[in-house]
């Protein structure tokens, strides 16, 4: 069953596939979604406040945002901080990325009847994007289709191409 879920998630994020929608409450309590950004080029950035490489990539993502936002570029961040939302909010402010969309991934932890730590993944959007490490960045085109998963250099080149520079 786990393998089937993983294969389905990998199929969801193949280039050309419609991006799985993420519709959640954002850092300000408003409901936001990827589908509402159709018509824009969207970078979906999976990160966490405790992830040093994630935080180090924000200045680069901010520079891309400044360069392309007026041309229709948005950044939709998914934080892996469900158990520490205060640290998530603090990191957003510290790193100066309030202009981006921010939601939590939706992984809920709890203790079962035997006192063992368990996870409820039913609302976990990271599973829909086959996320296994952070940071992971997916680019979505104006039609809402997956362009691909990119590192910083690849992302620069792809955005130049997409915005005709």
Predicted regions and their residues:
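N-proximal helix/coil linker or "cap" segments that precede and/or mark the start of modular domains
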Residues: 1-25, 35-40, 86, 90-93, ...
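Short conserved loop adjoining the S-adenosyl-L-methionine
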Residues: 32-36, 125
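Conserved redox-active cysteine motifs that mediate thiol-disulfide chemistry
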Residues: 38-39, 45-63, 67
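Active-site acidic short loop of glycosyltransferases
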Residues: 38-40, 70, 97, 131
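Short beta-strand segments
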Residues: 45, 75-79, 104
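Structural microenvironment flanking redox-active thiols in thiol-disulfide oxidoreductases
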Residues: 56-98, 109-124
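Thiol/disulfide oxidoreductase modules built on the thioredoxin-like
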Residues: 97, 107-164
